[in-house]
Amino acid sequence: MKRFLLACLLVVAIATPAEAQTCVVNDPTGTPLNVRTSPNGAILGALYNGAVVQVLKVIFDKRGRSWALVVPLEPGKQGWVFGAFLTCGR
């Protein structure tokens, strides 16, 4: 019975979609954070400190730096931003 319950929990955990994490732009330089087509790709736009975004995906480049695919909660373009300039909490 315990194995059955454990198997059921595992199926539910795998089948449940991950929630997008909400984060805030926090660039210590005070300059706008570039929103890009891909990690370190062409610039699509910019986000200012305090902008709230939803993180859809995080990847790491060859140098181990994080890049986040974000969607701004205010009107704006979905794109990739440098992850070090996001403050996220649960």
Where are these regions (language model features)?
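Sec-dependent N-terminal signal peptides
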Residues: 4-14
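Sec/Tat signal peptide C-region and signal peptidase I cleavage site
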Residues: 16-20
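Short N-terminal segments immediately surrounding and downstream of signal-peptide cleavage
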Residues: 21-36
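Surface-exposed, polar helix/loop patches in the mature regions of secreted/periplasmic/lumenal proteins
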Residues: 33, 79-90
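Short alpha-helix capping/helix-loop boundary micro-motifs
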Residues: 37-43
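SH3/SH3-like beta-barrel superfamily modules
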Residues: 47-84
